């Protein structure tokens, strides 16, 4: 539980500092009015931040995706997000940890958006449906941050925390550190998930932007499972931690 507390405090501090900074500056609407921006225009974007193949210590090759698309105006947008993996070999073979979210997003400050909607999980066992509430935006030092809370009609709760940063080494070469943590309020034996901090992924990727919308990359990913989740994985013959090499594409339209 100490690890859970540290993670929550860390992400809360980042988000809180970002909101405080935003509160001391001009609001998004005031900025748009001052610059005479057309805030009624509608536009959209689709992005796969991570579309990759991984191979690690366990010898289990896997395809992984993390993408999102949105459409709307300056203040309100409709978002679709999805992430997951397909394991090609080993005890975990098949679709794993896959989900799709449909969200309404509203600007609440210069740097932050409130997002409300639902999430549908896919994969082995019973599918789960969640209601989601979260924030997404830029923390100090331009860290892209997401913090989302989930609740299901079965009384289950969960949280997902994400942070990433793009460091420009040159005009085309970009280094991107990334971290994601998943937490659950109750154990779920059917899905091999323990309560508390379930898993933590920390990675770093180096991409080369042939064009801004098309960038191949290589990376290293460290994945660690904790508590009951680690016990479930070990009991099934897997490893609680793994280091993987990643090769993939970042593409957007």
List each model region and its residues:
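Outer-membrane beta-barrel initiation region
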Residues: 20-93, 105-106, 245
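Residues that define the transmembrane beta-barrel architecture of outer-membrane proteins
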Residues: 42-44, 61-65, 94-100, 127-131, ...
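Transmembrane beta-barrel strands of outer-membrane/channel proteins
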Residues: 50, 80-84, 116-120, 147-151, ...
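Residue-level signature of outer-membrane beta-barrel architecture
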Residues: 71-73, 106, 137, 151, ...
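Repeated loop/turn-to-beta-strand initiation elements of outer-membrane beta-barrel proteins
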Residues: 75-80, 110-114, 141-145, 170-175, ...
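Extracellular loop and loop/strand-boundary signature of outer-membrane beta-barrel proteins
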Residues: 83-90, 120, 132, 147-149, ...
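Detector for outer-membrane/organellar transmembrane beta-barrel domains
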Residues: 127-189
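Outer-membrane beta-barrel "beta-signal"
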Residues: 204-209, 240-253
């Amino acid at each position: 539980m100490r690890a859970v507390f540290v993670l929550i405090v860390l992400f809360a501090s980042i988000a809180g500092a970002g909101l405080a900074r935003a509160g001391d500056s001009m609001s998004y609407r005031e900025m748009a009015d001052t610059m005479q921006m057309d805030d009624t225009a509608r536009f959209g974007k689709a992005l796969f931040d991570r579309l990759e193949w991984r191979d690690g210590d366990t010898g289990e090759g896997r395809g992984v995706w993390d993408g999102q698309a949105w459409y709307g105006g300056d203040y309100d947008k409709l978002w679709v997000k999805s992430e997951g993996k397909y394991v090609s070999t080993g005890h975990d073979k098949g679709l794993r940890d896959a989900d799709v979210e449909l969200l309404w997003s509203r600007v609440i400050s210069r740097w932050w958006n409130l997002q409300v909607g639902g999430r549908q999980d896919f994969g082995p066992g019973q599918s789960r449906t969640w209601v989601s509430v979260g924030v997404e935006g830029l923390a100090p030092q331009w860290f892209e941050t997401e913090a989302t809370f989930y609740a299901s009609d079965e009384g289950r709760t969960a949280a997902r925390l994400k942070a990433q940063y793009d460091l420009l080494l040159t005009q085309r070469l970009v280094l991107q550190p990334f971290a994601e943590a998943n937490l659950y309020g109750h154990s779920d034996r059917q899905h091999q998930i323990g309560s508390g901090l379930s898993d933590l992924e920390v990675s770093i990727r180096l991409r080369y932007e042939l064009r801004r919308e098309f960038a191949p990359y290589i990376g290293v990913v460290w994945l660690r499972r904790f508590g009951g989740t680690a016990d479930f994985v070990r009991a099934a013959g897997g490893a609680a931690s793994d280091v993987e090499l990643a090769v993939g594409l970042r593409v957007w339209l």
